[in-house]
């Protein structure tokens, strides 16, 4: 039986904390101690630059970002530069991966299914990873794979402020814009509804037989991390 573990954080999480958590789960998945795991959360404002990204795509000085409460980090995922913040759904996938292209395509289709439910006609782009509405990117994807297990994942703009994307050249694409569910559908679904739809869509696209959700109000609650292992 193919089972999915879902970890749902109810409060915003610092990027560094989520990054460290992913690495712990990655080690556990590599050693077959846990099932494939999907982490769903929102971040405090942060701009991240992928390992092959170009820092010239950052349009503000780091000191300016700090003054307006946005962190900046260079990270070990693929992709270029992007922004994460409140009311944007971030999903991290700690999955065993057989084929990279097919894996990314399943992530994209999982998100497209959700957007279709909100009446948004979205699609993948064979040239540029992510999910698009016309020429506007609504979800970014950046992953890393080590020892055939993934980490990092996707960021879906729900009803977040899009202004911080003007501080960067998103994903290094100068002629592309960003959008959100709010902007495209003219209403703001609850984050809980989006999470539920994403979870069910991932289960369908990746062919899981069952899933179990663990809710945490904050990163500090991970002192109860053993409860995840006991369920395996």
Swiss-Prot record:
Pfam families: LplA-B_cat. Residues 32-219 form the BPL/LPL catalytic domain. The keyword Membrane does not apply. One of its GO terms (cellular component) is cytoplasm. InterPro entries: aa-tRNA-synth_II/BPL/LPL, BPL_LPL_catalytic, Octanoyltransferase. Pathway: Protein modification; protein lipoylation via endogenous pathway; protein N(6)-(lipoyl)lysine from octanoyl-[acyl-carrier-protein]: step 1/2. GO terms for molecular function: lipoyl(octanoyl) transferase activity. Its main location: cytoplasm. Disulfide bonds: none annotated. It catalyses: octanoyl-[ACP] + L-lysyl-[protein] = N(6)-octanoyl-L-lysyl-[protein] + holo-[ACP] + H(+). Its EC number is 2.3.1.181. It is found in: Cytoplasm. The keyword Cytoplasm applies. Transmembrane segments: none annotated. It comes from the Bacteria. The record marks 137 as: Lowers pKa of active site Cys. In the reaction, the free carboxyl group of octanoic acid is attached via an amide linkage to the epsilon-amino group of a specific lysine residue of lipoyl domains of lipoate-dependent enzymes. Belongs to the LipB family. PANTHER family: LIPOYLTRANSFERASE 2, MITOCHONDRIAL-RELATED (PTHR10993:SF7), OCTANOYLTRANSFERASE (PTHR10993). This is Octanoyltransferase. The lineage of its organism: Bacteria, Pseudomonadati, Dictyoglomota, Dictyoglomia, Dictyoglomales.
């Amino acid at each position: 039986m193919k089972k999915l573990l879902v970890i749902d954080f109810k409060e915003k999480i610092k990027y560094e904390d989520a990054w460290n958590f992913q690495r712990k789960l990655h080690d556990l998945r590599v050693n077959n101690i846990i099932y494939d795991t999907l982490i769903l959360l929102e971040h405090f404002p942060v701009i991240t630059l992928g390992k092959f990204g170009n820092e010239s795509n950052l349009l503000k000085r780091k000191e300016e970002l700090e003054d307006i409460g946005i962190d900046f980090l260079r990270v070990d995922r693929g992709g270029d530069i992007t922004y994460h913040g409140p009311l944007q759904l971030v999903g991290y996938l700690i999955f065993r991966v057989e084929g990279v292209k097919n894996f990314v395509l399943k992530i994209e289709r999982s998100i497209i299914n959700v957007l279709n439910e909100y009446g948004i006609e979205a699609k993948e782009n064979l040239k540029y990873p992510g999910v698009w509405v016309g020429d506007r990117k609504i979800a970014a994807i950046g992953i890393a794979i080590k020892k055939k297990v993934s980490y990092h994942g996707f960021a879906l703009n729900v009803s977040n402020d899009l202004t911080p994307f003007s501080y960067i050249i998103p994903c290094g694409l100068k002629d592309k814009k960003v959008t959100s569910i709010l902007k495209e559908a003219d209403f703001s679904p609850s984050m809980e509804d989006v999470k539920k739809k994403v979870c069910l869509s991932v289960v369908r696209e990746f062919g899981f037989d069952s899933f179990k959700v663990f809710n945490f109000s904050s990163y500090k609650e991970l002192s109860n991390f053993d409860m995840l292992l006991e369920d395996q």
